[in-house]
Amino acid sequence: MGLYARDAATGEYIKCNVSKGVILSTGDYSQNTRMLKHFCPEVIENNIQCLFTNVDVEGNFTNQGDGIQLGMWAGAQVQQSHAPMIHHMGGGADLAGVGVMGNAGFLNLDLNGKRFMNEDLPGQQLENQIELQKNRESWQIFDSNWPEQLPYMPAAHGGACYYEDYASEDEGPKNNTTYRNYKSPYQLEAAVADGRAVKADTLEELVAKIYPDDTAAQQTALDSIQRYNELAKAGYDEDFHKPASRMWAVENGPFYADKFTTALLLVCIGGLESDEDCHTFDADRNVIPGLYVAGNIQGNRFATEYPIGLKGVSHSMAMYYGYVAGKNALKDI
């Protein structure tokens, strides 16, 4: 038992023999198109791009699922259900994937001008809804009262939940706890200036900008906004049951919109079948002696997604089970 490694500089191979076992800790396969097509076809079908583009010294993507394939060749079984982590972080996203207003639960309309969901959703469920829409796109819409509304939004991954009152990059945020969860007038106006957001003095002007040459969608959007305003003022969303605490009438200009598209793939949660001792298993569910896993290659950690409300859950599990794998390999457990 052991491994072969190749020296990229010389091309020479190195053979390493081990006596206590092998620990596979090689990450996921989010840059391997063939594996994505097999295990997570929706990533390919929806043209989801991978957030991480790390490469090795030869320019090859590092997250190719090599360790999973090595384990399979040794007889290890792969977790059957996989969960691609595609956490939507809002429309008009910057290079870090963070949107103009994050995934805050403001009104959202499809390309026909219709409201189609309860907007108060976590990032993964929000992504699922966007993928069901025409062209996998929609419009987030809000008015000038957004600074007063942000504190009522959840502190979600990629969300916006507090307001910073600064109007220039030089001035900067006053409470720089995290760059992801605050929004400022400077950020919003910068997004308008570079085209990531749309601004208008009236709702009629706004819908004309976001639905150009489609008068039917413009009228449907105005009707949808009027309906949403009525529900917000009534304090009950009988259409999609969004909490009243996060519904506000969209009626005070200027008005803003930013386009939601598909989000970025963070990681594919689905590796080799494993347990709390980091073992791997063959087709008959027998432990494969001496073969352990830790990190994203370790399957059976999450069923559908990891809970983003539990901060650091993925990294902490990778660190902890790396320790467990090392300890068990040393003791031949």
Model regions: which residues?
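Conserved redox-cofactor binding core of oxidoreductases
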Residues: 1-12, 19, 33-34, 231-252
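Active-site and channel-lining beta-strand-loop segments
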Residues: 2, 104-120, 270-282
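Glycine-rich loop(s) and the adjacent beta-strand/alpha-helix scaffold that form part
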Residues: 6-91, 315-318, 324
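Short, glycine-/Ser/Thr-/acidic-enriched flexible segments
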Residues: 8-10, 21, 28-30, 114-115, ...
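C-terminal structured subdomain/cap of oxidoreductase catalytic cores
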Residues: 17, 156, 170-172, 270-333
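An anion/pyrophosphate-binding glycine-rich loop and adjacent beta-alpha core
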Residues: 68, 74-209
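Short, small/polar residue-rich loop motifs at catalytic or cofactor-binding pockets
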Residues: 101-103, 266-268, 311
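A glycine-rich dinucleotide-binding beta-alpha-beta segment and adjacent secondary-structure elements
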Residues: 202, 213-305
